[in-house]
């Protein structure tokens, strides 16, 4: 009998073992769809980004008008731009839900997979930040100025660091050029780290909603989960296309319709919605270095989560107290996101400070305490 090329060819064999004959737990829910959705987001962003880059000029005098030209004169340029801008939002929605799933179901106990995932989040945030600067609108320029300025809070080398990042004494042409170079490079780095992420995942196999070994009950990935992933894909593409076609500027800032002007500052400088929670934490500390450290900690804290797991059970499926804390944390993040979009005045300042405090308290103190308490209550 002739060998099956899918199982014998050196390259096809890898694809087969990763996407077709992959043994998968039989009970993973829709919360496990987001990994494949993130892969689709990345592919979409790279393709639309490449098409945009073909018409973009990374120069302060031409950047804004080159984006306008893409939207007005390039065949379907408006659609490509709208898909790229809103695709970023969906990328973040998917990654936040993916991380939330990981926390709820204890997937972080696969430490290598989790740590590469957090690195992916950080790289994605860097990519989105440098990408937001490229249209060279008012919010692009001032967002870049405010966020890069945070590096000046680093003791002793801060100012040098900022001027090195800027390529001058302010955000100007060299900054835009290097941000474009970085924005082009980073998605490919993300793709590379994604392969490492998957390699680590396939060492252990997927977790499942019960958090117990599923070795006794595995099914092939294809056709079961490939079909389920296509359903998830349809459910994501529908709102993405709806947003991109009907209200493409809903999540953007109106300030970005004004070309960048270093002489006039917008009344409220704020990042895109997916960074607002971190921005609120940054602003809640009335000290530059303290704020920067809190901002960094708000994401880097994810690296600590595996070390803070004190429960004898892996998932939160049968742990109602931890579930309550989890959803309080989720609500807390929504509050931080809202506060990040508000001006710095009463009562938003105090709400932001309380929400920031409870964010760190929940993750660092309450989760381990409640995990230990549940062990005692269940006599584990």
From Swiss-Prot:
Binds 2 heme b groups non-covalently. The chain crosses the membrane at residues 34-54, 78-99, 114-134, 179-199, 227-247, 289-309, 321-341, 348-368. Keywords: Electron transport, Heme, Iron, Membrane, Metal-binding, Mitochondrion, Mitochondrion inner membrane, Respiratory chain, Transmembrane, Transmembrane helix, Transport, Ubiquinone. GO terms for cellular component: mitochondrial inner membrane; respiratory chain complex III. Its main location: mitochondrion. Heme b b562 binds at residues 84, 183. Its cofactor is heme b. GO terms for molecular function: metal ion binding; ubiquinol-cytochrome-c reductase activity. It is a multi-pass membrane protein. A ubiquinone binds at residue 202. It is found in: Mitochondrion inner membrane. Gene3D superfamilies: Cytochrome Bc1 Complex, Chain C. GO terms for biological process: mitochondrial electron transport, ubiquinol to cytochrome c. PANTHER family: CYTOCHROME B (PTHR19271:SF16). Component of the ubiquinol-cytochrome c reductase complex (complex III or cytochrome b-c1 complex) that is part of the mitochondrial respiratory chain. The b-c1 complex mediates electron transfer from ubiquinol to cytochrome c. Contributes to the generation of a proton gradient across the mitochondrial membrane that is then used for ATP synthesis. Belongs to the cytochrome b family. Heme 1 (or BL or b562) is low-potential and absorbs at about 562 nm, and heme 2 (or BH or b566) is high-potential and absorbs at about 566 nm. The cytochrome bc1 complex contains 11 subunits: 3 respiratory subunits (MT-CYB, CYC1 and UQCRFS1), 2 core proteins (UQCRC1 and UQCRC2) and 6 low-molecular weight proteins (UQCRH/QCR6, UQCRB/QCR7, UQCRQ/QCR8, UQCR10/QCR9, UQCR11/QCR10 and a cleavage product of UQCRFS1). This cytochrome bc1 complex then forms a dimer. This is Cytochrome b. It comes from Cyrtonyx montezumae (Montezuma quail).
């Amino acid at each position: 009998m002739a060998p099956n090329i899918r199982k014998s060819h050196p390259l096809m064999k890898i694809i087969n073992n990763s996407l077709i004959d992959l043994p998968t737990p039989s009970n993973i829910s829709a919360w496990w769809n987001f990994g494949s959705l993130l892969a689709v987001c990345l592919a979409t962003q790279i393709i639309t980004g490449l098409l945009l880059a073909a018409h973009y000029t990374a120069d302060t005098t031409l950047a804004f008008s080159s984006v306008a030209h893409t939207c007005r004169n390039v065949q379907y340029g408006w659609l490509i731009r709208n898909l790229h801008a809103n695709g970023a939002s969906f990328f973040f929605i998917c990654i936040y839900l993916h991380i939330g799933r990981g926390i709820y179901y204890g997937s972080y106990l696969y430490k290598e997979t989790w740590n590469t995932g957090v690195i992916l989040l950080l790289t994605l945030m860097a990519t989105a930040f440098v990408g937001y600067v490229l249209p060279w609108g008012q919010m692009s320029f001032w967002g870049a100025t405010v966020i890069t300025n945070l590096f000046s809070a680093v003791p002793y080398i801060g100012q040098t660091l900022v001027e090195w990042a800027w390529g001058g004494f302010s955000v100007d042409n060299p900054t835009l050029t290097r941000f474009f170079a970085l924005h082009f490079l980073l998605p490919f780095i993300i793709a590379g780290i994604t392969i490492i992420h998957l390699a680590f995942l396939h060492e252990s196999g997927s977790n499942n909603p019960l958090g117990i070994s599923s070795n006794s009950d595995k099914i092939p990935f294809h056709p079961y989960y490939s079909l389920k992933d296509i359903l998830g894909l349809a459910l994501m593409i529908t709102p993405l296309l709806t947003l991109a076609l009907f209200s493409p500027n809903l999540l953007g800032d109106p300030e970005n319709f004004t070309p960048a002007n270093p002489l006039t500052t917008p009344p409220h400088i704020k990042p895109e919605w997916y960074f607002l929670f971190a921005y609120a934490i940054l602003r809640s500390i009335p000290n530059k270095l303290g704020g920067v450290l809190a901002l960094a900690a708000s994401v880097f804290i994810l690296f600590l989560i595996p070390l803070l797991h004190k429960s004898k059970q892996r998932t939160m499926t049968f742990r109602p107290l931890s579930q309550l804390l989890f959803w309080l944390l989720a609500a807390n993040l929504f509050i931080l996101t809202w506060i990040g979009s508000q001006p710095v005045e009463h009562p938003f300042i105090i709400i932001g400070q309380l929400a920031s405090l409870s964010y760190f308290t929940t993750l660092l103190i309450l989760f381990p305490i409640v995990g230990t308490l549940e062990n005692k209550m269940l006599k584990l």
